[in-house]
Amino acid sequence: MNKLFEEFVYMTMKKYEHETGFNFTSQKIKSLLITADGDRKRDTKVDIMAERTSGDKEKIIIDTKYKKFEGIDDFSNADVYQVSTYCILYNAKHAILIYPQWGNKPPEIQAYYLNNDIKQDRKVEFKTINLKHESLKDSMEQVRQEIQQIFL
């Protein structure tokens, strides 16, 4: 289900990217560790990379997680470490973790700044997408609305 959720979010974002001013790519690979001789170890794969198409070329790391998330107490430290590392590797100042919505309404969660980067505005956001719709079209429209809120 993890991969299916990731693909659904990515394909929906890709479909509506012309409305956002961002270009979305999936499974962008970069090495986490490289020796002085150029030997690569531990490649990383970003679920979705959003890059602004004009201006400052801002990058946003998007990581999808198909697991229960009803509030800030439900996040995993490992997930935040993961997107924080991606932000460092790709020189991004914004990461978004996207989960399916479990309750009847989305949790109200503010953006969090990495403790040592408050002045640099490096932040992590937690978003949910309601997948409990009558049709795939309705679910895609929900993702589209989320995309508009994030990127506009």
Kindly label every feature range from the protein language model:
Residues M1-L152:
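Catalytic core segments in nucleotide and nucleic-acid processing enzymes
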